[in-house]
Every structure is written in structure tokens, then in C-alpha cells.
């Protein structure tokens, strides 16, 4: 883009328009039946649309039941003539109204038709809460969108911390320290760097102590029952009607249609009264019908009174006194249950996350007669609205104007909503296809080749193209490339290429079967469209073709492909009209134009701009479509040649292994960067590139470097035939080598410095971001062990070198001491001639000598402090991160292999026995210690319906399944599991979870046990519970009073088990959906502009843009969406960085709730959101809230990984630091010791971070006045630093001085104590002043794993660790610390930088 500057300016103007629209007040006159005064004022602006107004009316209580109305501008202009997406500014301009600040709008009711009645019914169901009930039956699984956030019981977010910090800042400014920013920053909500925490009350300290105890005693393994105690906010909502449905008298008979009747309804109120209602074009009224008599006329009583209203809601409010009151009570209950509406809001364009383990008590069904009628009232008067031309709709939306912000926003919003609607419709149909509820179009074919057409969508098995890959893996290859095709479609959609379209696509995996869902190319079932070249051909060509054989004509009619390899693979088609649009696609994927030759008969005449397997088709809508985009990345030829051996047992499953787009893009960037560097160097040598605009060159005329980036491309068809150039093959081989030679080593190296993943899904996402395919997991696991061994060797080498260096330094010290001893001896001889002093004088002399020595060292220590080099310590949990990465890699390989084994089992198993097969598989895999030959639960009657081969899964044993999984790991990941790997290498509870998530299984919440000891203990408890239950039942029968009905809980504990799982433990299966939705570029552009404004110093505009961007995210994605959740978390981080701690804390809480509901209650994004939220609460000085959130995060990663995750060290350190600053030293000491223990267990005892914890513990002990005990910790820290950092490192030097000063202080105390026995204590204590800063050591806290660090002030070395100053006996702790640190004045306290997740 040569005109880059103009584009940037346009974007900035657009962003400016986002945050500064012209304001407009809407003065709305309502119909008289709503409000006699009829006035409603709504603030708006010129950029809002009629759609925005309608959405606003749906949330205002007074107008929310309105559905069928006209909107008149200035009392006469109907907005329907303008359209709903037109802005008020455009309407005002069209009507030539000038620039009014107020716009007169009138709402006028319209006569109902049947479609409008359906809309009114749907709105009523939403208002009364029936749509929450619908969710249960319409969901693709059970308990979607659960959350546990409200159970934490956080204190409200307050701004208390800001005031406290501000006061501390003023004190620091008086001392000339800790000054950051301008004094008036407090007014803008910014906070300054400080560590001061509010003084805590006794009650707060007790609360913190209890939370610390919870953290210490947190269980090591997952408790499934506790983990599924979800919030039940919606369960508190009461439906204000007992029954509401379309009446049995519907549809309206012909003789009543002429009277205006549209539909008949039946309602039963909470007062147990039943009313029959007529839906009339004038409104709704109670009629004279009964269950047996049809009379739809208006019902009047003897006084002539009747019930009629234009709005159904208002009519029901007249009929039932409890109706409105119940709705109001529901709203109160919801608001009191949680301060976060995100907890119960329903998504409008995304799926909720379904938990893999479900509390059985949450599995409820609520009666609702109208629920089964939703298909009737939701899809138009004849049900035809469910059938859509999906491709045509999406392409039409993409072609909408996008010249300004509002147009782009509306366009992106419509596209995202339609893509979700497609995915939802396709997923529901795919499930019905798998269950056999829909007939195929080709019933005679094999099951894997069946295709379906339903509701405008084509469905096929993921293996339907198996014939195309018969030599490269067949079914496995076909299944694999379908996902690669979808990945390419998402990229094309995001780039919004003009002139070429892709198919709306999603992939559904359900119960081990895959269905590919695609909206067909318009007209694909019609006769083949002529290409543009054929259109230009004359009549003479047509006459020549008349002589062709009839079969050739039929073949031409069937051929739909106009570009690429023909359907029968017999020729290469090259419609020139496709070249230009496909050229855009090739630029996105860096494809090289190339000739194709498969044989002498099948070859291209010119160069194809895309792969031969990418086909160009033309729809009857006139658009050009590109399909089969899986070949937009090259083959991973190095991997294929090494591991795919067709026909061999140990071969990789298929030969279609492709490189990820991320890897290709990274390779391309580095190649272009190398070209740029080479070209720059060349021009500089030739003198053609002037540096810094020398010779008076104008900035606009600076030299530009033209790079031949089109040469950095590859042939996607390389290695597909024998007729290819060596250059093309070499380029593809280079990209293939790039993964193992560059990307994987860089990934492993980076793992040293960052927090380890929490589960296999996060590991997979990280690998994908790096461009690494999961088939390299085995290689990564092997390399991790190699890198770990190398690191350990380097540490051992470092220790040996430092030990030798220590000996040298000790020898130097001995020599120095010898010389000093000689000097002392001479001084002693000179002093011998003087009179002998008393013991009191000697003690005083000791003190004075100590003072003198300390004073003598002060100047040199001050100088040393100024010139102190930065320590080379990194405090990274390298070994712990390597171990975690290795463990997760093994677990992910085993989980994925288990999924494939289970998929093969399910392929032969009838759907009716799926739960039994899955439970048996899990017993065989995970229950080997309990029962090596578990029995499958198959009822003889059920078995009689199927063949023996269909129930062959029952013959599986523990040994069989473990061997199959190990074989899959070997073939798919090229990794050999060691013997007894199931006991040694994987953690069974976490593997259980991973398989459930990957296969889409929902289990009942139950304390599943995986060891023989735990299982037997569980069985004994079950027997005891059974005895208690029987006693209670007998007692209840004798009771005169009836106990209230309890919800049915399908308890799997009612009988003794012989294995871990039973079929009844499985609640159900959920589909795993991959869709073609994408992130619009609009939000990225605005966010980039907002960050730019913030960095440039315009914080008001930047913050306003961020706030508006939150609204944009909610408009495009909906409030309940994973993308919205991630953006909330991002905005919270920005707020915190700017010092808006309160706002960050509020936004962080919202991010947690949305992550739980849209990502999963124990998803890694949710864990990160909890940790970030804890950090934001801590920054806002709400320590108790922070501890509660950290505790929940730890409980979550215990279920996904185990408590011993490296993040445990991070959490314990952050919490301990917080308690230390709050002066709760006892709790801080407990957690620092726990952090040291965890660090020693995970990362070894001799590590830099272990030394740091010893140092922190010593500081706490000093704060507690346990001086002698602190010396041991200082010594331990010093020994570690000497070994790992060397004797010359600043940390080693400082800890050595600490040890010396502590020893000196102990000597000082002893001398003072001896003197105090002889004489009264002095009125003033003069402390030694050897200046050694304790905080210089702790300032360099781990920057890798978030173990806490201190912020440096504008690049200067931070020399201040917070110390306490409670008053004690004759001295304060501050005096003690000043002595230990050697300072005459306390340093400014620095803020602990707790690492965010």
C-alpha cells in the first residue's frame, strides 16, 4: 500500500468519529394505550440507526412488549422508506432538517398479521422468562454457560486503595523519593507507584489468616463434586404463567379468517384460571372458547366487561394479578443474586461452553406447552424461513457499503450473526444426520460417502472424498484436509478479497463422527454455467460442438469446475476470468504461479495462480467461488518422507501432512526481512541510500527500497507429480525444515521464560500460534528432555566454576585478613602501654568500635551501591517449566490418541450403546489398577437388537486399550511410550478431563477414584451411605408430615461398583464445532488507534475510544462471547497500566464471568482471567478479594494439571508479598516457606529463585525481630547465590554484607545487653550505619514466571524492599532494618510487581 500515510490518517479520523459523534435527542411520542402523556426522551447521536432505536425500545420497560409498530419522523415520514440500517444523520440530511439537536419521532401501532402475532408471542416469552426454559431443550448439551464466580463472595470494588496510595505518595514526595508523574495525576484517577497498603483491622487480618490456611490446605487433586457447585441464578426465576401455548383450536378456520382472527392461544395463570385468547388484527382478547366448545368471539360478562388489549403482555397483566408482580420479583431476585448481569444473559451469536462434568441436581426439565411449538412460531407462517440461501446472504452482506465506521460496524455485525445462525442450524442438522433422522440424497452409497441437503446446506461425512486420497491415507487424509480447508476459508474471509467468494462452512464432530457442512454454490445442481470464454465464442463453435458424441455432451453438462483440476481429474481448466481474483488469494497465501503437468495428456497450457486442487466455480448469482482451499500451504515433505510409508503398520496415518499458515507466514516474513537487509546493505555500499536524510533530501523524497517479495513464494503443488522443477521442491523443503530447525527450538527456548500451559488445549494453541503442527509433539517431548539435560549440565558446570572462584576469593580474603591481623597486632602492642580500662569501658568500646566501623564503611558502601552492577539472576523456573512442558506433551499425545481409539470403537458401535461403550473404554484405560478386565453393561434385550460385531467393544480389556493407545501415540506422534506409561507418565484425573473435552463427553459429578485404595475406600463409604439412606427412608415413612418434593438426582452411588464408571455416569455428548467466523479488522484498527492515542499522551481520547470499543465488541459479538471476554481482560490490563485500578478491577471481574460462560468454567482462559482479576484487586488494595480469586485459580488448575503447576510458586509469592506489605508477617512467612518448598520440589533446591525465597524469608524474620533466625536464611541465600551467580554477583555481595551486618547486630545487642546490666539504658540509641540495601536483592524478582518483582523508577536501580515499623520494646523494627541495611534513613517503598497471567 503505497499511500500508507493517507490510510492511517483516514483510520484516525474514523476512530475520532467513533468517540465524538454529534449528539441528538429523540423525543418519542408513544401510543396512548402505553402512556397517556406519550412522551419518552432518549439520548442518541447522528450515527445511530433505526435498528439501534428499536433495540433500545426493547429494553425500556414501558415499550419492551411493543413489536408491531410504525416509526414516523416529524410525524409524517415513515422510516421504512429509508431502511433500518440508515443513520439518523442520513435521514436528517435526506429530509433537509438542518442540524437539529432534537428529533421528533412518533410510534404508531399497526394492524397485526399472523407473522406479527408470532413475533408478539416470542417477545412475550422473552419477557416472562420462558426463553431461559427454552435453553434447556434447545441447547446442544446440558448446563451450558455455567459460572462459579458469584460463590466467591467478593467485597464490592472500592476506591479505598487510591486514597491510601495518594497519601503515601505525598509523604514520599516530601522525602524526595518515589516521585512518579505529576502531583495532579490523582485527579485523573491515576495512581503512583507505591507499596503502601491500608492499615488492616483485626477482623481483616483474621480473614486473611483464614484464606491463607485455605490456600495451604488446598487439596492436591481434583474434587469433582466441589468443582461442579455452579451458581444457580436462573433457578431463582419463577415463570409467571402455569401454561401458555397455541390453542388446540388453531389454525384459524377459513370462516373466521374473514373476521380478522389470526391465531388462538390458551393461557393458565398462577391463579389456576384458564383463558382462551383470540389473536385479532386489532389486538388480543379473551374469547368464549373452552376445551370442548369453539367460540372465538369476544367474551363479556353480565356487566358488559371484557378483556382486550393491543399488547398480549398487557392483556395477561389484566387477567392475572400475580403476573406483573412475579416478573418484578424475578427482576429483583436477579439483581440481588449477582451484580453481574453477564451471569445469566443469553448469547445471541455464540454457543455457550458446556461443562465436561455436570452436577446431577442441575439436570431439570420444566413443563412448557409452547416449547414444542417454537418451530412453528419462529420460522415464519409456513415454516419456510429456516431455509435460506446462506451463501447469497453472506456474500450480499460482504458487498454492503463500508465507506464509514457505522457502515462497517453494521456490516460486520450482520456477517457475524449470520455465520453463527448458519453454524447453529448446520450443527443441529448434523446431529440429526448422525442419529439417522434424515434421509440421504444417495441412499445406495457406502455410509462414509452419503451426502445430504437440508435447509439450504450440504452435509457430507468428513471422509466423503476418500477416493481422492486413496494413495495418501484415504479416510484419515480426507478427514484431515477438511479441517485445513476450513482454516484457509477463515483466512480468506478475514482478508475480504474482492471478486472471489468462499463457501460458508463449518465442521461438526459428534460422538466420534465428523460432518462437513457447507452452503452449496448457488446453482450447483443446475446445468453447468458457461464460462466467460464460452460466452464470447460464436455460433460456428457451437456448430462444431454439435458433432460431438452424446456422452461427451453429458460430461460437459456435469462439469462445474471452470478453473483447476476437473472433477474427474482428466484435464486442467483455465478460465482466464478467474485469474485476477484468484491472484489476490495467491498473494494472501504467498503462492507462486506455476505450470501443472500430471501426465502428457493432463497438463496446463499456462501457469495456474493457485494449486490445481483449488477449484474455481461460478454460481448462478454471478459470483466466482473458490473451493477446496486445503492446498494453500505446502506439504510437510520432510515429515512425510520420514514417516509416511503406505501400507506399513508403523506408518503415519496419511501422507497429506500440511504446514500451518502461521509457519508459512513466519518463513515469509524472515525471508523478506533478509531481502530487505541485503538490499539496504547493497544500496548503502553503492551510496544510493542516504542516511538520516543527508544532503538536504526532503522526507517525502527519501529513497524507497523496492523488494521483489513476489519472489518469496512457493509452489503449492510441489511433490504432487514427477514433472516439477528442483527449485520449487527446494523451496517447499526449506519451509518444511524451517519447523524443526527454527520454530520448535525457539518455542522450547521461550518456554523457559514464560508460565507453563495449564492444560493440553493451551499447549496446542501455543504450538499453533508458533506454526507448529501437533504431530511434532513427540519430537518436542524428546527435545525437552535434551534441553533439560543440557541446562542441568550447564548449571553443574557453572557451580563448579563458581566454587573454584569462591576458593580464589577466600584465599584473597585470608591474605587480606592476615594483613589486617598484623596491623591489629601492632595496634595492640601500642595500646599495651596505656592503662587497662574497666569492663564497662570495654563494652562501650565495643559499641563505639561498631559505630566507628559502620561509619567507616558507610561512604564506601554508598559508593558501591551507586556503582553496583545489575545481578545476572533471572529467577526463572526453568526445570519446572521443562518438566511441565514434557508432562503436558505426553498427556496431550495420550489424550488425542485415546480420542482416535475411541472414535474407531464408536464407528462400529450402534448409537444406542454409545454410553456403554464409552464407559467401558474409560474403565479399560483408566481403571487398570482396580479391574483389568471390566465387564461392559449390556442388557440382553438391548444386545438382541444388534450383531455380535456391533458389541465387540465389550471384549476389550485394560491391556488391549493401553496397547491401542500406545500404538496410536507411536503412529501419530512418532513417540514411543515407555512400559507402564499409564502409571508413570500421566495423571489419570487430568487425562479423564482431556478425553472428555476432546470427544465431547459430559459426565455426572461424582468423586471418581483412580487407585485401588481410593476405590475401596469409596465403596465402603457408599455402603455406609446406603445404610443411612435406608434408615432415613424408614423414618420418613413413620413421619406424619410429608417432606417437600426434592429434585431428582441420578446418583451413581446407589449400588456397589466393580469399576470406576458406569454408563449412567454419562449425561450426554456435545458437538465440537469449528466454524468459519473471523475477527473483523475494524476492531483491530480502532484498538490500535486507541493504543496510539494513549502512547502519544492523549489519554482522554484513548480511554474514550476503549470504552466505545467495548460497546462495539458487544454489538458485533454479543455480550456473552469468548471474544468479548478476552477483550474485557485486555481493556482491564490497559486500565491498570494507566493507574485506573478500580476500573481495572471491575472490568477484570466481568472478564472472569464471561470466560467461564463462553470458554468453560475450568478453561485455561478462565484460569488466566481469575489470576489477572486477582492482580487487579491487589493493585486496588483489596487483598482479601485478591486471595479469594487466587485460591479459585489454584483450585481450577488443580483440575486441569494438578496443584503442582509452576504457577503455584507465582501465586504463593504474590500472596505472600501482599501479606508482607499489609504487615501480616506470620501469614507471609507461612506462604514464603510454602513457596520455597514448592520451588524446591518443582525446580530443585539449588536454584536462583530458591535463593530469593530464602532472602525474602530472612527479611520477614527480621521484621518479626527474629534476628538470629534470619541469619540462617541469609546464609542459605548466600550459599545458593555463590554457587549459581558467583561470588562477584551483586546478590552474592549483598547477602554477604547482610550476614556480616546481622552478626554485627547480634554482637551489638549482646554488648548493649551487657552494658544495660551495669548502667541505665541511654536516652538515645545510635544504630550502626553500614549502608547495604535489603531491597537491592529483592528488586530483581523473577521476570519470567511472575514470582513478583519490584518496579524500577524510570530506569534507575530500585534499591528498596518494603520493611515494617511496628513499635517494640526500646527499638523499632525499622531501626533494626536500618541497621541490617546500613541506612540512616528509610528508603522509599517500592511497589511489588505481581506478574499477571
UniProtKB/Swiss-Prot annotation:
The lineage of its organism: Eukaryota, Fungi, Dikarya, Ascomycota, Saccharomycotina. GO terms for biological process: intracellular distribution of mitochondria; mitochondrion organization. Residues 161-203, 686-703, 812-831, 839-860, 1019-1033, 1375-1384 have a biased composition (Basic and acidic residues). May associate with the eukaryotic translation initiation factor 3 (eIF-3) complex. Belongs to the CLU family. Residues 158-203, 526-555, 686-707, 812-869, 1019-1050, 1314-1397 are annotated as: Disordered. Residues 1034-1043, 1386-1397 have a biased composition (Basic residues). PANTHER family: CLUSTERED MITOCHONDRIA PROTEIN HOMOLOG, EUKARYOTIC TRANSLATION INITIATION FACTOR 3 SUBUNIT EIF-3. TPR repeats lie at residues 30-63, 559-595, 1167-1200, 1209-1242. The gene is CLU1. InterPro entries: CLU-central (IPR033646), CLU_dom (IPR025697), CLU_N (IPR028275), CLU_prot (IPR027523), GSKIP_dom_sf (IPR023231), TPR-like_helical_dom_sf (IPR011990). SUPFAM superfamilies: Hypothetical protein c14orf129, hspc210, TPR-like. Residues 368-640 form the Clu domain. mRNA-binding protein involved in proper cytoplasmic distribution of mitochondria. Keywords: Cytoplasm, Repeat, TPR repeat. This is Clustered mitochondria protein homolog. It comes from the Eukaryota. Gene3D superfamilies: Hypothetical protein (hspc210) (3.30.2280.10), Tetratricopeptide repeat domain (1.25.40.10).
Amino acid at each position: 500500500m503505497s499511500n500508507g500515510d493517507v490510510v492511517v490518517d483516514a483510520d484516525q479520523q474514523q476512530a475520532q468519529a467513533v468517540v465524538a459523534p454529534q449528539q441528538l435527542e429523540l423525543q418519542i411520542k408513544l401510543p396512548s394505550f402505553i402512556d397517556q402523556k406519550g412522551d419518552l426522551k432518549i439520548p442518541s447521536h447522528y450515527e445511530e440507526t433505526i435498528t439501534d432505536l428499536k433495540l433500545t425500545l426493547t429494553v425500556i420497560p414501558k415499550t419492551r412488549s411493543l413489536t408491531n409498530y410504525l416509526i414516523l419522523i416529524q410525524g409524517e415520514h415513515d422510516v421504512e422508506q429509508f431502511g433500518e440500517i440508515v443513520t439518523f444523520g442520513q435521514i436528517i440530511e435526506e429530509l433537509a432538517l438542518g442540524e437539529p439537536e432534537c428529533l421528533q419521532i412518533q410510534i404508531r401501532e399497526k394492524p397485526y398479521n399472523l407473522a406479527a402475532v408470532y413475533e408478539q408471542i416470542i417477545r412475550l416469552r422473552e419477557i416472562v422468562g420462558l426463553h431461559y426454559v427454552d435453553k434447556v431443550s434447545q441447547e446442544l448439551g446440558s448446563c451450558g454457560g455455567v459460572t462459579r464466580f458469584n460463590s466467591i463472595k467478593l467485597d464490592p470494588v472500592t476506591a479505598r486503595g487510591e486514597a491510601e496510595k495518594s497519601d503515601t505518595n505525598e509523604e514520599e514526595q516530601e522525602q524526595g523519593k518515589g516521585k512518579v508523574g505529576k502531583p495532579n495525576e490523582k485527579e485523573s484517577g491515576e495512581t503512583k507507584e507505591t507499596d503502601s497498603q491500608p492499615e488492616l483491622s483485626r477482623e481483616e487480618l483474621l480473614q486473611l489468616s483464614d484464606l491463607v490456611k485455605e490456600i495451604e490446605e488446598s487439596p492436591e487433586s481434583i474434587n469433582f463434586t466441589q468443582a461442579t457447585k455452579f451458581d444457580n441464578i436462573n433457578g431463582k426465576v419463577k415463570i409467571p404463567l402455569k401454561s401458555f401455548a397455541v390453542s388446540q383450536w388453531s389454525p384459524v378456520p377459513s370462516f373466521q379468517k374473514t373476521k380478522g382472527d389470526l391465531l388462538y392461544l390458551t393461557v393458565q395463570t398462577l391463579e389456576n384460571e384458564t383463558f382462551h385468547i383470540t389473536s385479532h388484527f386489532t389486538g388480543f382478547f379473551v374469547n368464549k372458547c373452552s376445551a370442548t366448545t369453539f367460540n372465538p368471539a369476544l367474551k363479556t360478562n353480565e356487566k358488559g366487561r371484557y378483556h382486550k388489549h393491543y399488547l398480549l403482555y398487557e392483556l395477561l397483566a389484566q387477567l392475572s394479578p400475580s403476573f406483573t408482580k412475579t416478573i418484578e420479583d424475578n427482576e429483583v431476585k436477579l439483581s440481588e443474586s449477582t451484580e453481574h448481569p453477564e451471569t445469566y444473559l443469553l448469547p445471541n451469536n455464540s454457543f455457550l461452553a458446556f461443562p465436561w462434568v455436570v452436577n446431577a441436581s442441575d439436570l431439570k426439565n420444566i413443563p412448557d406447552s409452547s416449547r414444542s411449538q417454537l418451530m412453528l412460531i419462529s420460522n415464519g407462517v409456513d415454516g419456510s424461513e429456516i431455509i435460506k440461501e446462506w451463501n447469497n446472504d453472506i456474500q450480499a452482506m460482504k458487498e454492503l457499503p463500508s465507506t464509514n465506521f457505522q457502515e462497517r460496524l453494521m456490516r460486520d455485525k450482520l456477517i457475524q450473526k449470520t455465520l453463527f445462525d448458519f453454524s447453529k442450524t448446520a450443527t443441529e442438522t448434523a446431529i440429526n444426520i448422525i442419529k439417522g433422522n434424515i434421509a440421504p440424497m444417495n441412499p445406495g452409497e457406502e455410509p462414509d460417502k452419503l451426502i445430504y441437503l437440508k435447509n439450504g446446506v450440504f452435509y457430507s461425512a468428513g471422509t466423503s472424498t476418500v477416493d481422492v486420497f486413496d494413495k495418501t491415507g484415504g479416510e484419515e487424509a480426507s478427514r484431515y484436509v477438511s479441517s485445513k480447508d476450513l482454516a484457509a476459508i477463515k483466512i480468506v474471509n478475514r482478508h475480504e478479497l474482492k471478486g472471489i467468494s468462499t463457501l460458508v462452512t463449518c465442521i461438526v464432530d459428534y460422538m466420534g463422527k465428523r460432518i462437513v457442512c457447507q452452503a452449496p454454490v448457488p446453482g450447483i445442481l443446475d446445468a453447468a454455467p458457461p464460462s466467460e470464454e464460452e460466452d464470447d465464442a460464436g455460433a460456428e463453435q457451437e456448430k462444431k460442438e454439435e458433432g460431438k458424441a452424446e456422452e461427451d455432451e453429458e460430461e460437459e453438462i456435469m462439469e462445474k469446475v471452470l478453473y483447476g483440476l476437473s472433477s474427474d481429474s482428466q484435464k486442467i481448466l483455465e478460465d482466464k476470468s478467474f485469474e485476477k481474483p484468484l491472484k489476490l488469494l495467491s498473494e494472501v497465501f504467498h503462492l507462486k504461479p506455476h505450470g501443472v503437468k500430471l501426465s502428457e495428456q493432463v497438463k496446463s497450457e499456462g501457469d495456474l495462480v493457485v494449486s490445481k486442487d483449488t477449484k474455481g466455480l461460478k454460481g448462478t448469482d454471478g459470483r466466482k467461488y473458490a473451493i477446496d482451499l486445503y492446498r494453500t500451504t505446502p506439504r510437510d515433505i520432510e515429515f512425510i518422507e520420514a514417516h509416511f510409508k503406505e501400507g506399513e503398520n508403523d506408518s503415519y496415518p496419511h501422507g497429506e501432512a500440511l504446514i500451518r499458515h502461521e509457519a508459512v507466514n513466519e518463513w515469509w516474513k524472515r525471508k523478506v526481512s533478509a531481502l530487505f537487509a541485503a538490499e539496504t546493505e547493497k544500496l548503502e555500499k553503492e551510496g544510493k541510500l542516504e542516511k538520516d536524510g543527508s544532503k538536504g533530501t526532503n522526507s517525502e523524497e527519501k529513497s524507497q527500497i523496492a523488494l521483489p517479495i513476489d519472489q518469496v513464494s512457493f509452489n503449492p503443488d510441489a511433490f504432487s507429480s514427477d514433472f516439477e522443477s528442483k527449485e520449487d521442491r527446494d523451496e517447499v523443503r526449506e519451509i518444511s525444515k524451517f519447523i524443526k530447525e527454527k520454530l520448535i527450538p525457539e518455542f522450547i527456548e521461550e518456554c523457559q521464560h514464560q508460565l507453563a500451559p495449564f492444560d493440553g488445549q493451551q499447549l496446542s494453541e501455543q504450538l499453533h500460534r508458533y506454526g507448529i503442527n501437533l504431530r511434532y509433539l513427540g519430537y518436542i517431548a524428546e527435545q525437552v528432555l535434551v534441553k533439560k539435560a543440557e541446562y542441568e549440565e550447564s548449571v553443574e558446570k557453572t557451580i563448579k566454576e563458581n566454587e573454584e572462584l569462591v576458593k580464589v576469593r577466600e584465599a584473597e580474603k585470608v591474605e587480606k585478613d592476615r594483613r589486617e591481623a598484623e596491623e591489629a597486632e601492632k595496634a595492640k602492642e601500642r595500646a599495651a602501654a596505656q592503662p587497662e580500662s574497666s569492663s564497662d569501658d570495654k563494652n562501650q568500646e565495643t559499641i563505639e568500635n561498631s559505630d566507628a566501623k559502620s561509619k567507616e564503611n558507610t561512604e564506601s558502601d554508598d559508593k558501591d551501591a551507586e556503582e553496583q552492577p545489575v545481578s545476572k539472576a533471572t529467577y526463572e523456573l526453568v526445570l519446572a517449566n521443562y518438566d511441565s512442558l514434557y508432562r503436558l506433551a505426553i498427556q496431550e499425545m495420550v489424550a488425542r490418541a485415546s480420542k482416535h481409539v475411541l472414535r474407531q470403537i464408536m464407528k462400529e458401535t450402534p448409537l444406542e450403546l454409545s454410553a456403554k461403550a464409552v464407559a467401558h473404554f474409560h474403565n479399560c484405560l483408566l481403571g487398570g489398577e482396580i479391574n483389568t478386565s471390566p465387564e461392559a453393561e449390556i442388557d440382553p434385550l438391548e444386545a438382541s437388537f444388534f450383531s455380535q460385531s456391533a458389541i465387540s467393544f465389550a471384549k476389550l480389556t485394560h491391556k488391549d486399550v493401553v496397547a491401542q493407545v500406545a500404538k496410536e501415540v507411536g503412529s501419530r506422534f512418532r513417540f514411543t511410550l515407555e512400559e507402564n506409561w499409564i502409571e508413570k507418565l500421566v495423571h489419570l484425573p487430568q487425562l479423564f478431563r482431556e478425553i472428555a473435552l476432546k470427544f465431547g463427553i459430559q459426565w455426572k459429578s461424582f468423586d471418581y477414584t483412580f487407585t485401588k485404595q481410593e476405590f475401596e475406600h469409596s465403596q465402603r463409604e457408599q455402603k455406609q451411605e446406603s445404610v443411612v439412606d435406608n434408615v432415613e427412608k424408614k423414618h420418613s415413612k413413620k413421619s406424619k408430615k410429608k417432606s417437600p418434593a426434592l429434585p431428582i438426582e441420578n446418583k451413581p452411588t446407589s449400588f456397589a461398583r466393580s469399576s470406576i464408571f458406569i454408563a449412567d455416569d454419562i449425561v450426554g455428548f456435545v458437538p465440537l464445532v469449528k466454524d468459519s467466523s473471523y475477527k473483523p479488522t475494524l476492531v483491530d484498527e480502532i484498538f490500535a488507534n486507541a493504543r496510539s492515542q494513549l502512547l502519544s499522551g492523549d489519554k482522554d481520547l484513548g480511554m474514550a475510544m476503549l470504552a466505545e470499543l467495548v460497546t462495539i465488541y458487544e454489538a458485533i459479538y454479543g455480550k456473552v462471547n469468548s471474544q468479548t471476554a478476552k477483550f474485557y481482560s485486555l481493556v482491564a490490563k490497559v486500565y491498570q497500566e494507566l493507574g485506573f485500578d478500580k476500573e481495572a478491577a471491575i472490568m477484570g471481574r466481568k472478564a472472569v464471568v464471561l470466560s467461564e460462560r463462553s470458554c468453560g468454567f475450568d478453561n485455561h482462559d478462565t484460569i488466566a482471567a481469575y489470576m489477572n482479576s486477582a492482580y487487579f484487586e491487589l493493585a486496588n488494595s483489596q487483598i482479601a478479594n485478591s486471595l479469594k480469586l487466587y485460591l479459585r485459580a489454584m483450585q481450577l488448575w488443580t483440575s486441569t494439571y494438578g496443584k503442582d503447576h509452576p504457577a503455584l510458586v507465582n501465586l504463593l509469592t504474590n500472596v505472600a508479598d501482599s501479606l508482607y506489605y499489609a504487615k501480616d508477617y506470620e501469614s507471609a512467612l507461612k506462604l514464603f516457606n510454602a513457596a520455597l518448598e514448592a520451588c524446591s520440589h518443582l525446580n530443585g533446591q539449588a536454584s536462583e529463585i530458591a535463593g530469593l525465597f530464602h532472602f525474602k524469608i530472612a527479611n520477614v524474620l527480621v521484621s518479626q525481630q527474629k534476628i538470629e533466625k534470619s541469619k540462617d536464611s541469609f546464609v542459605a541465600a548466600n550459599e545458593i547465590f555463590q554457587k549459581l551467580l558467583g561470588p562477584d554477583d551483586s546478590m552474592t555481595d549483598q547477602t554477604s554484607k547482610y550476614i556480616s551486618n546481622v552478626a554485627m547486630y547480634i554482637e551489638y545487642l549482646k554488648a548493649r545487653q551487657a552494658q544495660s546490666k551495669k548502667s541505665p539504658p541511654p536516652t538515645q540509641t545510635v544504630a550502626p550505619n553500614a549502608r547495604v540495601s535489603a531491597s537491592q536483592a529483592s528488586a530483581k524478582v523473577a521476570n519470567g514466571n511472575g514470582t513478583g518483582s519490584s518496579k524500577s523508577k524510570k530506569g534507575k536501580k530500585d534499591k528498596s524492599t518494603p520493611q515494617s515499623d511496628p513499635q517494640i520494646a526500646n527499638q523499632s523494627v525499622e531501626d533494626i532494618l536500618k541497621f541490617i541495611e546500613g541506612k540512616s534513613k528509610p528508603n522509599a517503598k517500592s511497589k511489588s510487581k505481581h506478574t499477571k497471567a
